[in-house]
Structure formats: structure tokens, C-alpha cells
């Protein structure tokens, strides 16, 4: 049984979606266990207003046991006060986005070429008498077929 063009296109689209999902979730945890509840007493409190500008690129948290502020940095920043840009994180995120974009574009182009090819093959198999198909086939026909006494594919004439 030969799969149809539609089945093949759906299969290719399924593979594309699976690859994109795998790339997107490449750093996620493998277990689906629910998160464990935190202790009732937290080690962090909100920073007082006097430390509202303590973190440059992050969120301020006040460490209860040490009685001092600490920062939770935004993505792409590091340091005690989130003052340094993490260039490796920025470059890695940019490259990942470019790779996903390139993969999607190449897959869409390949899928379009595949669908067009399948439609053309189907057209020429079902409608062999179609002028357009005949012109396409006859353009590649070699005259040697006529010299050997065979029937030409485009003409019903036989050369003796």
C-alpha cells in the first residue's frame, strides 16, 4: 500500500512538531511529579523600601537568617546585585531561536516541494492525456524510442 501525499505530509508535519517540542523542552525536568511544598517558615522576606534599588537587573529578597539583602537575577544577568550581563546566556538563547527558526523554514519549504511533487505525479498518472502533462513528458522523451519501432509516449504513431 502506497501512502498518499496527504498522509505523507501529515507524517512530515508530525515529525516537525515533535522536533520543535523536543528543542523547546530540552532543559525541563524528566519527571512529572508535583512540586514538593515549601516549609511553612520561609528563609526569605520582601526587601524593605530602603533596599528597593539594591538589585540592578533582578528581584530583591531579604535573607532572614543572615539579615541582609540578596538578588534573584533576571535571565541573562549574574552577580551579587545582578550587575553583570551573562553574554553566554544571551548568545545561547539567540542561537537556539535561530536554529528553531531555520528548522521551521526549511521544513515548510521541503513540505511545499513534497506536496507539489506529489500533486504533479498524481496529475500525470491520472490524466495522461492532459496537454500540460503530455508537454512535460514529451520534453524529456528521447528519439531513440521512435527508432526502435516502439510507440511514442506522446503520440500514437509508431515508426517502422
From Swiss-Prot:
<dbReference type="GO" id="GO:0008284">
    <property type="term" value="P:positive regulation of cell population proliferation"/>
</dbReference>
<dbReference type="GO" id="GO:0043410">
    <property type="term" value="P:positive regulation of MAPK cascade"/>
</dbReference>
<feature type="topological domain" description="Cytoplasmic">
    <location>
        <begin position="125"/>
        <end position="160"/>
    </location>
</feature>
<dbReference type="GO" id="GO:0045840">
    <property type="term" value="P:positive regulation of mitotic nuclear division"/>
</dbReference>
<dbReference type="GO" id="GO:0050679">
    <property type="term" value="P:positive regulation of epithelial cell proliferation"/>
</dbReference>
<feature type="propeptide" description="Removed in mature form">
    <location>
        <begin position="90"/>
        <end position="160"/>
    </location>
</feature>
<keyword id="KW-0339">Growth factor</keyword>
<comment type="subunit">
    <text>Interacts with the PDZ domains of MAGI3, SDCBP and SNTA1. The interaction with SDCBP, is required for the targeting to the cell surface. In the endoplasmic reticulum, in its immature form (i.e. with a prosegment and lacking full N-glycosylation), interacts with CNIH. In the Golgi apparatus, may form a complex with CNIH and GORASP2. Interacts (via cytoplasmic C-terminal domain) with NKD2.</text>
</comment>
<keyword id="KW-0472">Membrane</keyword>
<comment type="function">
    <text>TGF alpha is a mitogenic polypeptide that is able to bind to the EGF receptor/EGFR and to act synergistically with TGF beta to promote anchorage-independent cell proliferation in soft agar.</text>
</comment>
<keyword id="KW-1003">Cell membrane</keyword>
<dbReference type="GO" id="GO:0007166">
    <property type="term" value="P:cell surface receptor signaling pathway"/>
</dbReference>
<dbReference type="InterPro" id="IPR000742">
    <property type="entry name" value="EGF-like_dom"/>
</dbReference>
<dbReference type="GO" id="GO:0051781">
    <property type="term" value="P:positive regulation of cell division"/>
</dbReference>
<dbReference type="GO" id="GO:0008083">
    <property type="term" value="F:growth factor activity"/>
</dbReference>
<protein>
    <recommendedName>
        <fullName>Protransforming growth factor alpha</fullName>
    </recommendedName>
</protein>
<keyword id="KW-1015">Disulfide bond</keyword>
<feature type="domain" description="EGF-like">
    <location>
        <begin position="43"/>
        <end position="83"/>
    </location>
</feature>
<dbReference type="GO" id="GO:0005615">
    <property type="term" value="C:extracellular space"/>
</dbReference>
<feature type="propeptide" description="Removed in mature form">
    <location>
        <begin position="24"/>
        <end position="39"/>
    </location>
</feature>
<feature type="transmembrane region" description="Helical">
    <location>
        <begin position="99"/>
        <end position="124"/>
    </location>
</feature>
<keyword id="KW-0732">Signal</keyword>
<dbReference type="GO" id="GO:0007173">
    <property type="term" value="P:epidermal growth factor receptor signaling pathway"/>
</dbReference>
<feature type="disulfide bond">
    <location>
        <begin position="73"/>
        <end position="82"/>
    </location>
</feature>
<keyword id="KW-0449">Lipoprotein</keyword>
<dbReference type="GO" id="GO:0005154">
    <property type="term" value="F:epidermal growth factor receptor binding"/>
</dbReference>
<keyword id="KW-0325">Glycoprotein</keyword>
<feature type="lipid moiety-binding region" description="S-palmitoyl cysteine">
    <location>
        <position position="154"/>
    </location>
</feature>
<dbReference type="GO" id="GO:0005886">
    <property type="term" value="C:plasma membrane"/>
</dbReference>
<feature type="topological domain" description="Extracellular">
    <location>
        <begin position="24"/>
        <end position="98"/>
    </location>
</feature>
<keyword id="KW-0245">EGF-like domain</keyword>
<feature type="disulfide bond">
    <location>
        <begin position="47"/>
        <end position="60"/>
    </location>
</feature>
<feature type="disulfide bond">
    <location>
        <begin position="55"/>
        <end position="71"/>
    </location>
</feature>
<keyword id="KW-0564">Palmitate</keyword>
<feature type="signal peptide">
    <location>
        <begin position="1"/>
        <end position="23"/>
    </location>
</feature>
<keyword id="KW-0812">Transmembrane</keyword>
<keyword id="KW-0497">Mitogen</keyword>
<keyword id="KW-1133">Transmembrane helix</keyword>
<keyword id="KW-0964">Secreted</keyword>
<feature type="glycosylation site" description="N-linked (GlcNAc...) asparagine">
    <location>
        <position position="25"/>
    </location>
</feature>
<feature type="lipid moiety-binding region" description="S-palmitoyl cysteine">
    <location>
        <position position="153"/>
    </location>
</feature>
Amino acid at each position: 500500500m502506497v501512502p498518499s501525499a496527504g498522509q505523507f505530509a501529515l507524517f512530515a508535519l508530525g515529525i516537525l512538531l515533535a522536533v520543535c517540542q523536543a528543542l523547546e523542552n530540552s532543559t525541563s525536568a524528566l519527571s512529572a511529579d508535583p512540586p514538593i511544598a515549601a516549609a511553612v517558615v520561609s528563609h526569605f522576606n520582601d526587601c524593605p523600601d530602603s533596599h528597593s534599588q539594591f538589585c540592578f537587573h533582578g528581584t530583591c529578597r531579604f535573607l532572614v537568617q543572615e539579615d541582609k539583602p540578596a538578588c534573584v537575577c533576571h535571565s541573562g544577568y549574574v552577580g551579587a546585585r545582578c550587575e553583570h550581563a551573562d553574554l553566554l546566556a544571551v548568545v545561547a538563547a539567540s542561537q537556539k531561536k535561530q536554529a528553531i527558526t531555520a528548522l521551521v523554514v526549511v521544513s515548510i519549504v521541503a513540505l511545499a516541494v513534497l506536496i507539489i511533487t506529489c500533486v504533479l505525479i498524481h496529475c500525470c498518472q491520472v490524466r495522461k492525456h492532459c496537454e500540460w502533462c503530455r508537454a512535460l513528458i514529451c520534453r524529456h522523451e528521447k528519439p531513440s524510442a521512435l527508432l526502435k519501432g516502439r510507440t511514442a509516449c506522446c503520440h500514437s504513431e509508431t515508426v517502422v
